[in-house]
Amino acid sequence: LGLYPGEFERVPFEDDYFVDVERLKTFVKSCDVIVHLAAVNRHTDAHVLYETNMRLVKQLIEAMEATNSCPYVLFSSSIQEERDNEYGRSKSDGRKLLEEWAVCNGASFTGMVVPNVFGPFGKPNYNSFIATFGYKLTHGDSPTVLQDNEVNLIYVGSLCRHICDKIREMGSRTAPSLVERDDVACDFEMKVSEVLGLFENFKKLYFEQGIIPPLNNIHEMNLFNTFRSYIDMESYFPVKLVQHTDVRGSFVETVKIGVGGQVSFSTTAPGVTRGNHYHTRKMERFVVIKGKARIQLRKVGTDEVLDYYLNGEEPAYVDMPVWYTHNISNIGDEILYAQFWINEWYDPTDSDT
């Protein structure tokens, strides 16, 4: 939603609204649409998990009824509704409670039954086996496959687009209120062992050698961007490049790629900064060829800034993760020469910038 500030106005929400009834009431009164994603995914006590998830739904309903508010509610349930566990039951029962509220109050409701979600920054050992694989492989551990099932997977970006489209559809709807179960389609299916095999290849080529691996489709690209998100940015970058030097000068290999894209270079005057944008899908590499540079990265939604100092006398690169604002500044006294590789040709109509 934050990518479309001219279309959607986000109403701030904090977790502690669930322990402050008045603030929760104020929140629901301010909303035309509420997307309810809050839930406990795992807990050592299954009863606590179920009761917590149900309590969150009931508190939302109570706040809406107390304020006579009838926003369009989208609820994130799970394909685990069909499984015999407390998490699945909590999602199914929560969805049905919200359906009943919508019918009784003439409100619109979409109960999304969502496949297994993955994407950058998921919590290892909690959100997804993909998060666990990515974290372990980039932190010196070796994951194992416990159950090699075929898994329905959806990238978090696809789910967000689906939610945005649902809100748009409701905004243009002229018919009476709608109450629906929405079985969200997966992006693709893959065995757990196949995901692990891909990630092990990402580790071997990219994490250990700096080679951009072959990515055969958008799903593998999304998996690669997810893998990259678990790298410890502060300790991993910048990566020094090998210089081959003789009487003729120096030769440096800056990027080895298994995919296409676009290579460019820039000159930057002393004291000038380029960039200050982020990408949601693109991969990008900055290489300092000559001069002194500072590259800065900041994860969207946080205040921590990572500073990397590079010098053309020791050529090195920094790769830009998705959802990190980045820039490059000339901190020297001479012209800065930098090379950029990005995995897509620039398209001004879809710049992802």
Kindly label every feature range from the protein language model.
Residues 16-67, 80-84:
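NAD(P)H-binding glycine-rich loop region in Rossmannoid oxidoreductase-like domains
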Residues 158-243:
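Mid/C-terminal beta-alpha module of Rossmann-like enzyme folds, strongest
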Residues 55-105, 109-112:
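Conserved Rossmann-fold NAD(P)-dependent oxidoreductase catalytic core, especially the SDR/UDP-sugar
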Residues 301-304, 331-353:
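Double-stranded beta-helix
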Residues 7, 99-122, 135, 141-152, ...:
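Conserved beta-loop-beta element that borders a ligand/cofactor-binding pocket
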Residues 299-323, 327-329:
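Short acidic-glycine-tyrosine-enriched beta hairpin
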Residues 235-276, 282:
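A short glycine-rich, His/Asp/Glu-containing loop-to-beta-strand
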